[in-house]
């Protein structure tokens, strides 16, 4: 279990959200975070608690491509920004995750300092997701390609599709939910 201390420095500004756990890849020693070359990175079987007084906190930021997966990860985000930011696609996946609380359960959009990236790799599939008690939107999505939810249980303010500039981006498939 990963626990963020109450009122932790650097996690107090929701205009500049910041993840507790963040995976990335490097192009060069000075050029980091290119999700389309983040391969075979796994985040499996753990819990994250975002503490009190951390309105800018995100539990997990894990966006990658082939072989990248997030499985059996659960975030307590009451009073925080979001449980998850970014998601895998292109041969990766997300399964058996949950978020309780937060402004957003899943915030699938770009944030600074990497605002040019979409909120996902192409065509993300998220299965067996449970989102409860969010205050703004359960899911905010600006994905590359369609977002597919399978077996989603959402008890909160719904899904917002933010759209992207290309016609093939931003669609939503909801299956057995």
Predicted feature residues:
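Extracellular/periplasmic carbohydrate-active domains that bind, remodel
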Residues: 1-177
């Amino acid at each position: 279990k990963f626990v963020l201390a109450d009122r932790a420095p650097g996690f107090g500004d929701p205009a500049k959200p910041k993840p507790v756990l963040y995976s990335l890849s490097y192009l060069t020693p000075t050029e980091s975070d290119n999700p389309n070359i983040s391969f075979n990175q796994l985040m499996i079987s753990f819990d994250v608690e975002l503490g009190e007084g951390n309105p800018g906190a995100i539990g997990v930021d894990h966006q990658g491509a082939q072989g990248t997966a997030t499985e059996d990860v659960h975030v307590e985000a009451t009073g925080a920004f979001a449980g998850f930011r970014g998601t895998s696609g292109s041969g990766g996946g997300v399964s058996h995750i949950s978020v309780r609380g937060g402004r957003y359960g899943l915030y699938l959009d770009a944030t600074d300092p990497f605002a040019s990236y979409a909120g996902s790799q192409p065509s993300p599939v998220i299965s067996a997701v449970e989102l409860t008690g969010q205050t703004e939107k359960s899911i905010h999505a600006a994905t590359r390609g369609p977002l597919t939810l399978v077996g989603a249980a959402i008890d909160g303010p719904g899904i917002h599709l933010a759209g992207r500039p290309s016609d093939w981006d931003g669609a939503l498939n909801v299956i057995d939910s």
